[in-house]
C-alpha cells in the first residue's frame, strides 16, 4: 500500500456511570453514527438513583501512521462533554474500525475482529479495492470523502450450516441445510474450489435446487463430482448484519478420472529393454502418488495445464509378467489404486509387428490392445487391437481437442454454477473458432453436446442473447453442417443416433432467445439463413418471408393468427430460420401414416417461431410454398417427442395443397421445424404383386433344386478343363446362395417379426448375406469371362482363381452384411416394419441396392465387351457365314448373360425414375424367377450338360465317350493327343 497521509481509529470505550441524572450521552465525534446519522441519538438511560450502568462511547482518534501504536499507550483525555460529569473509570477499550486514507482522498475502512459494517451501509459503499475475495463481506468498505459510519459489535451467529458428511461420493446428492434462529433475507450460495479462491455463484438449475421454509433454507446438488467439491458459502442478512457461513465438502477421485497410459502393456524384451508408465489425474485434485514395485525405477512428476502425471520409468524388462500399481492418496480420503499389467512376450507367441502408420506401434502380443497418446492439445487415447491372427486391426481414435472439452465442461457446469448471461455468449464465441479444428467424431459430438447444454441453460434462466452471440451460434451451425465434416457425422451418429435431433432442438431454443432490442436481425451463409423482425400496429397485415434456396421457399403467417397478439399492445417478434443439410443428419424415423415408404427430403428445414413479451407461442397457421417439387409429397414437421426422444417426422396438423403445377403448398397449424418428404414413386400395397413374387420365388426354389440334381449327375464330366471348371463353379455357388436366400424369403412371413425375435433377425441377416453373395458370384463369373476374352493366351491357376472367387463371393458380402447389422441394429433401423427383412429405407439403399447395381454395371460392361468380340469379323469364313454367326452369338450372349449376370436388376433403376406400376411388375417378376433363368440358361441350354445328362440317364459308363470341351485355349485331350481348333467366341460364351 502507498504511504498514508493520515490514519484514523474508531474505539469503543466502555465506562461505568454512577449516580447520573437521566440524560443522553453523546459520542466523542458527533458526526459519526452506526447508520450514518447523528451520534447524539445514541444513549444509555439512568434508571434510578444510586444505580450503575455501562455507557459505550465511540471515540474517533487521528494520528500519524507511524506513531499510532504508541499513542494508544498514553492516557486519554475525555472530551469536554464528558469532563463536566462526575469522575469515570475506563473499564474497557476495543478497536472497532481502522481507516487508512490515501492521497486521492479515499479511505479504506476495515473492521476489527468481532465487528462489522451493518448491512445497510455495506450495500451503499463499495468493497475495498484489491480485496475481490471479500467483496461479499462487510469487513472493509471504501469511502470517498468523510467516513460516515463505524463498525459495530456483532451479535451471536443467528444460524447454523449443517452437512451430513464432508465426504461426498461421486454421483451422490449433496444436501446443505441452513437452520435460522432469526429472520434471514437476501440468501445466496457460493462455491470456492480448492485451487481457485474466487467464489462461484450458485443458482437453481438442472443440477442445483434451492429450498426455503420457515426456520431453514437448503441447497441440494443432484450429482456430485470433483467439479462440485470445495468450500460452500451461505451469505445472508439477519439482525442488521451480513453473515457468511462456510462448509467444506470433499469428493474422492474416481477411477475413471485416472488416466493410465497404457492401462495394459505387452512388451518384447528383445525389441525393447525398458518402458514408461504414466498415471495422470486432474490438476485440481490434491493427491500424491506412489508406484510399486518401484525398485530400480525412477519416478517423476510432470505437470500440464490441467493435469499432472506421475511417471514411472522402468529401465529393464521384468523377468515375468508383473502388475505395477499407482496408489493415489489424499488427506482424509480413501486411497485409490490404479493397476497396470505388464505381459512379457515369449518366444513362439503370435505378435503384430512394428508399425509406424499414423503413430508408432510397437511389437504387441496377439489379443492385446496397443495404446498411444493423443497429439498435443488433445485429450484421450489412440488404440489399436492386435488380432489373434497377428494382424493389426483399424485404429480407434478417441482423441478430442482439449479446448472443445473445456468449453463443454464450462457449459455443463452452467447447470448450477456461474453467471449464464456472461458465460453463454463467451462459450458461443469460443466454440465457433473450434469447428475448423475438429478432426474426429468425438470432436463433433462434444461440440454438438456443448450447444445442447447451452440451450438448456438459456431456457432455464431465460437468458437473452445479443446479436453478436446469435451470430456466433449461427456461424458455428453453418460450419457444423458443412460437407467437409460429413464423414464425422456418419461415424458419430453410429454411436449417438439422436445427436442430429438434439442439435436441431438446441438451435431452435437459442434462436428464440434473441433480445427484442436486436430486431430486426438477419444472417446469411451457405447452410444457414435467418430473418427476424418485430410486428407492430403499423406493420402490414400478415407476415411473409422468402428464401433463395432449392427448392425456392416462401413462408407466411396470415393476419388472423397474429392479430390477437399485436392488438394486445405487445411487441411480437417472428423469426424464420432455414437450415440446409441438417435434414440429412436426422434419424430416418416416421410416425404412423408414413411407415414402410422410403423418403427423401429437399435438403432444408424451416423453423418458424413467434415470441411476445419473452413468451414463445406454438400455435399459429403457417403457409409454406415449395417450388419445383415433383412426385408424391408429404408436409411434415420434426416431432421431438416420439421414438423415445430420438424424434421423427410427423404429418400431424399439416396438409399438402397443390397451388399450381410448379408450386406445392403446405399448411400447418403449429410452429416447429418443417420440411417436406418426397416419395416420388411410391407403389401402394398390391396383393397381386405380392402373390406373383411369392409364386415366382417358389418356382425359383424348385428350379434351383433341379439344377443341383443335374450338377450332381454330370459334374465330373462337364468340368474337365479350367474354363468350364470356373464357369460351373460360379454357377453352382450362385445356385446354393440363391436357394438359401429364396428359402429364407419364403419363410419370413411365417416368423414372429420384431427386434425381440432372434429367429427374425437371423432370417433377415441370412437373406441379406446370401442375396448379396449371389451377385458377388455373378461378378466373379463376369470377371473370369472378361479375362478369357481379353487375355486369350494367358494361363490361369485353378487354385489361385478359386481362392480369389471364394473370397469375393463370400467374404465381401459377409463384410457388407456384418457392418450393416452392427450399424443399424443398435438404432433399431435394421428390420422392415412388420417384416423379417431389411428396412426399406436407407439400410436397403446403402447396404444392398448400391452394391447390387454396381455389380450389375460391371457385368453390363463385360456384356458389351463380349458383344464387340462377337461382332469382330472372322478371317476364315465368308461374309454370309460371318454375319450369321455374329448375330447368333449376340443373341446367345444376350439370352444367357443377361439373366445369369443379374442384369435384370437394372430394372430397379427404372422403378426409381418411373412411377408406373408396369416397371414394378416387370422388376418383381423377372427377379423372382432368377432361379428359373439359371436352370434354363445355365444348365438346359448348355449342349455339353445336356449331352452328359442324356448319356448318364441312358446308363452310359464309357470313359472313351468323353465330352469334347471347347475352350479359349489349346489343350491336350485326356484320351487324344491331337490338337483341337481354337474355339469361336460364341462357344466361349456357353463354356
UniProtKB/Swiss-Prot annotation:
Region spans: Disordered: 964-991
BP term (GO), one: cell surface receptor signaling pathway
Transmembrane domains' residue ranges: 695-715, 731-751, 758-778, 800-820, 851-871, 893-913, 917-937
PTM: Autoproteolytically processed at the GPS region of the GAIN-B domain; this cleavage modulates receptor activity.
Biased composition (Basic and acidic residues): 972-991
Record-annotated disulphide pairs: 635-666, 654-668
UniProt-annotated site: Cleavage, residues: 671-672
Listed GO CC annotations: membrane
InterPro entries per UniProt: Adhesion_GPCR, GAIN_B, GAIN_dom_sf, GPCR_2-like_7TM, GPCR_2_extracell_dom_sf, GPCR_2_extracellular_dom, GPCR_2_secretin-like, GPCR_2_secretin-like_CS
Chain intervals for the UniProt region annotation (GPS): 635-684
Domain GAIN-B: 519-684
Cytoplasmic side: 716-730, 779-799, 872-892, 938-991
Positions in the Extracellular compartment: 21-694, 752-757, 821-850, 914-916
Signal peptide segment: 1-20
Glycosylation sites: 75, 102, 118, 321, 362, 484, 571, 589, 630, 660
Annotated compartments: Membrane
Keywords attached to this entry: Disulfide bond, G-protein coupled receptor, Glycoprotein, Membrane, Receptor, Signal, Transducer, Transmembrane, Transmembrane helix
Membrane topology designation: Multi-pass membrane protein
Keyword Ubl conjugation: no
Tissue-level expression: Expression is restricted to testis and circumvallate papillae.
Quaternary structure annotation from Swiss-Prot or TrEMBL: Heterodimer of 2 chains generated by proteolytic processing; the large extracellular N-terminal fragment and the membrane-bound C-terminal fragment predominantly remain associated and non-covalently linked.
Described function: Orphan receptor.
Protein family: Belongs to the G-protein coupled receptor 2 family. Adhesion G-protein coupled receptor (ADGR) subfamily.
Record protein name field: Adhesion G-protein coupled receptor F3
Origin species: Mus musculus (Mouse)
Upper lineage: Eukaryota, Metazoa, Chordata, Craniata, Vertebrata
